[in-house]
């Protein structure tokens, strides 16, 4: 297993003078003042889009769309620091960096309208999953092939609840969605 695979899901911590540790996210946020961000970028909360306010290089001109897609999200490099656009949108709208994770309520990773963003815990953010993982053979969230039928299962606070065996994956998925709406506060499906 590579170091990158081992570190996935764990915040990368950096030791600084005095023995304290900070995550790379904390260091990145502290490295740039909001005034600098506001000088360089303009955010439209209704569209969720950032534009450059001034020319920063030969490639970046005033009025150009800011950011590049990366795994469905938009990332913006400002003064040498790479920021997720949804974190910048939160900062521009609330005046503060998010305390936890920013969740896209409608599940569209590139939709950075402020009405689509919320600051939630990692657990709640994970509860807003809308699609089955790529390795799920049934193609339905919360459903596994089980003998000659399909079983639905849901997890909350580390505890798995069995939702029954069903003849079709659609019926098992319907049972999962019903339980998800009742159990998961982050659920928006």
Predicted regions and their residues:
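Intrinsic low-complexity/disordered segments
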Residues: 2-3, 23, 83, 101
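Short, cationic Gly/His-enriched loop motifs
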Residues: 40, 45, 55, 79-158
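Short, surface-exposed linear segments at secondary-structure transitions and domain or protein termini
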Residues: 68-74, 92-97, 169-177
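An aromatic-rich alpha-helical recognition segment common to small helix-rich domains
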Residues: 86, 143, 152, 169-180
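Short arginine-rich
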Residues: 178-189
């Amino acid at each position: 297993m590579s170091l990158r695979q081992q570190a996935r899901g764990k915040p990368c911590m950096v030791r600084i003078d005095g023995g304290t540790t900070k995550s790379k996210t904390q260091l990145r946020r502290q490295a740039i003042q909001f005034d600098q961000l506001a000088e360089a970028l303009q955010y439209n909360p209704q569209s969720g889009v950032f534009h450059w306010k001034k020319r920063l290089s030969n490639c970046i001109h005033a009025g150009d769309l800011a950011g590049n897609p990366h795994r469905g999200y938009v990332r913006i490099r400002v003064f040498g620091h790479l920021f997720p656009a949804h974190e910048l949108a939160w900062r521009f709208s609330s005046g503060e960096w998010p305390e936890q994770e920013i969740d896209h309520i409608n599940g569209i990773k590139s939709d950075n309208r402020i009405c689509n963003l919320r600051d939630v815990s990692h657990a709640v953010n994970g509860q807003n999953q809308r699609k089955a993982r790529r390795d799920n053979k049934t193609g339905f969230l919360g459903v596994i092939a089980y003998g000659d039928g399909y079983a639905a299962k849901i997890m909350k606070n580390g505890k798995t609840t069995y939702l029954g065996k069903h003849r079709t994956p659609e019926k098992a998925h319907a049972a999962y969605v019903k339980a998800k709406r009742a159990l998961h506060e982050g659920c928006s499906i």
